[in-house]
C-alpha cells in the first residue's frame, strides 16, 4: 500500500490535522505524487509552499506509515 492510499483510508474525512492533510491530498489528486517516496512527496509539498506545520505533520505521518507497513509484514 502506498502512502496516499494509507492516508486516505485511515484519515480522510476526519476532523483532525491528519484528516486535513488527507483531504488536501485528495483535493490535489491530479497533482499529488500518489506513488511518491518520502523525498518526492516532500519536494511536492515544498513546491506547493506548504507551511512548516504541514511539513512536520507529513513527516510524522510518514513515520507512522512506515511502521504500519512494517507491522503488516510481520
Question: What kind of feature is each model-predicted range?
Answer:
Residues 27-31, 36, 40-74:
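Ankyrin repeat (ANK) tandem alpha-helical domains that serve as protein-protein interaction scaffolds
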Residues 1-23:
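N-terminal acidic leader/helix
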Amino acid at each position: 500500500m502506498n502512502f496516499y492510499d494509507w492516508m486516505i483510508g485511515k484519515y480522510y474525512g476526519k476532523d483532525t490535522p491528519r484528516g486535513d492533510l488527507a483531504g488536501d491530498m485528495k483535493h490535489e489528486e491530479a497533482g499529488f505524487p500518489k506513488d511518491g517516496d518520502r523525498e518526492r512527496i516532500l519536494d511536492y509539498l515544498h513546491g506547493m509552499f506548504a507551511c512548516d506545520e504541514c511539513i512536520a505533520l507529513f513527516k510524522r505521518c510518514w513515520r507512522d506509515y512506515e511502521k504500519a507497513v512494517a507491522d503488516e509484514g510481520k
